[in-house]
Amino acid sequence: MLDPDDRHLLIEALKPPPEMTLDIAVGTTFTLDLQALLVAPVSFALFSATAPGGESDSLALLEAVRRHADRITIFCQAGCIAVPRTLQPVLAWLEDSVVPVAPPRPGRLFHPKVWVLRFRNDAGEYAHRVLVASRNLTFDSSWDTIVCLDEDPAATESDDNEPLRLFLDELSAGAVQRPTDDRQQQISDLVESLRDVKWELPDGALEVRFWPLGGDHRLPDLTGDRSLVISPFLSGDTLQWLSSGGDRHLLVSRADALNSVGSLPLDGFEETFVLDTDAVEDSDDEPEAEQERVGIPLRGLHAKLFLVERGRRCHLYTGSANATGAGFGGNTELLVELVGGFPRGLFVLILQLTVDVDHLRPGQHLLRGIQHQRIVPLRLILVASLGL
C-alpha cells in the first residue's frame, strides 16, 4: 500500500537487479505529469552513473538521463498531460517517450497503470519486472496499491503471460501518433521476450494472472463466497454484481461515492467503510471521469482492490479498475491477480499488503464504519472479510 507522500517505493521498484542496467521500459498511465515522468530516467541514470564511492559525475549523469529516456516509452490518455509552466530543456529528451492514446470509445478512458521492464547484463542476459499499480504517473497525494513481480531466474517453466503480452502489443493500435520505429521495435522485442518468463511470487501466492480489460477481453470472476472490495469510485450495477452470491461482503470507499449509489446496491454488503476523515484529507466530490483531471493532484483513497474467497482459494486482484461500469465495461484497464491457499496463503498475502500501512503515523491507516461509527484498522478489515 502506497503512502500518499511516498515516492521512495516507486523509485526502489525501478532499481535494476545487481550488475544489470535498463534495456527497455514500457509504462502506461491515465494522467501524466512530465516532471513526474522525469523520475524514471533520472532514477535509472542515478543507478548507472553513481560511482562506487557514492558520487556521480554531472556530465555522465546528464548523458545517462538522455540515454535512458530513449529506452522508456509511456502511453497515456490523449489530452491528459500536465506540462510545467516553465519548460525545462531536459524535458525535450522525453518528447518521443510520450505516446498519447485515444479513449477506446466515447465516455470511456485509457486508464491502466503498468510498468513492464527488461534489464540486461554485460553477458546479454535478460531479467524482467512488472509493476501493476493504481497510481498515475503524477504527484498525487493518494492512497494507492502497487504489486511488483520479478522474473524467477531459476524457473524451468513459464507463466501464462499471453494476456500481458497481448496488452502491450495492443497499445500502439490506439495511439494518436504511433511510436517511432525504434520504440515500436523495443515494444515488439519486449513482448517476445516475455513469452518464457516465470515470475517470483510473494510468499503465500500460488499463481499470478494478468487481466487486461476493455475491448474483447473477458472479465475476471470477482464474485465469491466472501469478499472485500476497496474502490474510490462506485456504480450500482457493478456493486450488485460483486456482491451476488456468497454470504459476506465488505466494502471500503469514499463517503461521496457511497452516497451517490444509494442504499439498494449496498444491500449485498454486510458492512461499508470510508477512510477516516480525521486521519486523511479525502478526495473531492467529483465523478470518476472528472476526478483524475490534469494538473489537479488526487487525495484520499485511490486504491482499487478486490479480495475474493472461492472454495479453498483466495484471489487478490489489484490494479487500475474501479468498481464501476466504466472500469469493467469499456475502459482500457489492467488488473493483476494473485491466487493463494486458504487460510495461510491468504493471511500471508494480507500481511504483505498491509505491512507498509502499519508503519504510518498513528491514526492514518484507520477506517470508520458508516453504520456503526466504528474505527477499525485496515488489517482487521482484511482479516474480518474472510473470518480469520
Cite the ranges covered by each PLM segment.
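PLD/PLD-like phosphodiesterase catalytic module centered on the HKD motif
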Residues: 1-226, 231-369, 374, 378-380, ...
